[in-house]
Amino acid sequence: ELADFIDKAMIATGPMYNSDLFSVINTTGGNTFNIPTVNDTTVAAEAHTEGGTVTDDAGKDVTFGQKSLGAFAFDTEWVRWSYELANDSIFNVESLLGELLGERLGRIANSKLTTGSGSSDVEGIVTNSGLGKTAAAVAAVTSDEILDLIHSVDPAYRNSPKTALMMNDSTLAAVRKLKDGNGNYLLSMGNFQAGVPNQILGYNIVVNQAMDSLATGKKVMLFGDMSKYYVRKAGGPSLFVARERFAPDYGILGYVRFDGTLANAAAVKHLITA
C-alpha cells in the first residue's frame, strides 16, 4: 500500500531572482537589451576667472557606455514517467514533477546569476564585483576585515536601501562567532518568522548557497548595493508535457531564458581569502 503523500527532500538555493533586492527586468522576447551607463564621478568643475576664456577642448566631455543583457537558455532535459504511475498514484505525478523541474530551473538560475563566467555565459554578480578586501587567512575572516569590506564601498552605494552583505551559510556560521573589541557579537540576530533578517552594522545579510565556502582564494562575501545587479528574464519559465512522444509513457521538460550583469563594479565588492 502506498501513502497518500510524498516526502520531498529540500535544499536552499539563493536569492538571485528576488526583485526586492535585485533589479529584475521582465521582457517578452530575448533580443539583446542594453542598459546605458555613465561614470562622471572623477570629474569636477573648475574655478572661473572674471573675463577669462572657458576651456573647450573636449577634455571634460561626458562618456557614455552600456551593459548588454542577452537571453541564455537552460533546460532540465526530458523527465519521463510511466502510464501506470500516472494512473495508479494517489498524488498528481505531473504536478509534482512540474514543481521539481521548476526548482531545478531555479537552482541553475541562482548559480549562474551568482558565479556565471560572463564569457558566452551569464555574468554572475560575484564574477564582476570589485575587490574590496583580501583576508589574511585562507579559511577565516575577521571582524576588522568585514569592516574594511564595508568601507571599501563608497557611501553613495552604502546608503542604498538595497545594500546588503551576501555569503553562503557556512561562511555565515563563521561570521556569527566573531566579536568586536568590546566582546559583543558582530552579528545582530534577526527573527525570520517576523521577517527580520540577520544584520551586521545595520546591513541585512543575504544567504546564497551558490557562493563559495571559506577556502584558498575564494570570493566568500559580497557587500554593496544589490540593486545595481540587473537580472533579465526573457519570458517566464516554461513546462512542456509530451503525451504522445513517449507513449504509452509521458514526458515533461522545463525551459528558461535569462541573463544578468552588474552595471558598476564599484557598487558591489567582494572579500577574497588569501
What spans do the regions from the language model cover?
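Sequence/fold signature of self-assembling virion shell proteins
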Residues: T63-K67, F72, S95-G102, K179-A274
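A short acidic (Asp/Glu
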Residues: I125, V175-K179
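Acidic/polar, low-complexity extended loops/arms that serve as protein-protein interfaces
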Residues: E1-P161, L187, F192-N198, I205-V206
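Flexible loop/turn segments at secondary-structure boundaries
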Residues: T42-A45, D88, T171-V175, D212-A215, ...
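C-terminal amphipathic alpha-helical segment
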Residues: S160-A173
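Generic hydrophobic alpha-helical scaffold/packing signal
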Residues: G102, L147-I150, L172, R176, ...
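Active-site-proximal beta-strand/loop segments in catalytic clefts of secreted hydrolases
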Residues: V38, M167-S170, Y255
